[in-house]
């Protein structure tokens, strides 16, 4: 990878954040920050302006869809990958309507995550 790609992970699950961080860092990406909920994720995005955000949909305080909406309003070119549990089709459709770039389904598949992140990074 020629230049550093900075990624923000937004998820209320400590386990999910750890798995994603390990997976992303093993691919050469830099995780610049983690957030526990959508509100914190939005504030960290605003402060750090990472190249890409992974955002869980279901979180306390502010969900991922609301945070996605705020991020896209602030920066329409932001790259946001939504993380969802299987069976959340309605929420996936809503996130796409609000500007989500892609989806990753839990449990994480290393090849799927790598392919999606690489494709979005190359679009920048």
Positions of predicted regions on the chain:
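Receiver (REC) domain active-site loop signature in two-component systems and cognate sites
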Residues: 59
């Amino acid at each position: 990878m020629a230049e550093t790609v900075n990624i923000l992970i937004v998820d209320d699950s400590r386990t999910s954040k750890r798995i994603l961080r390990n997976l992303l860092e093993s691919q050469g990406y830099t995780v610049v920050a983690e957030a526990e909920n959508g509100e914190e994720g939005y504030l960290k995005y605003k402060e750090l302006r990472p190249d890409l955000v992974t955002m869980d949909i279901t979180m306390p305080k502010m969900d991922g869809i609301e945070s996605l909406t705020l991020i896209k309003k602030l920066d329409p070119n932001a790259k946001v990958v939504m993380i969802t549990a299987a069976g959340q089709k309605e929420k996936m459709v809503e996130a796409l309507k609000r500007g989500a770039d892609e989806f990753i389904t839990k449990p994480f598949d290393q090849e799927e995550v790598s392919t999606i992140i690489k494709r979005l990074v190359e679009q920048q």
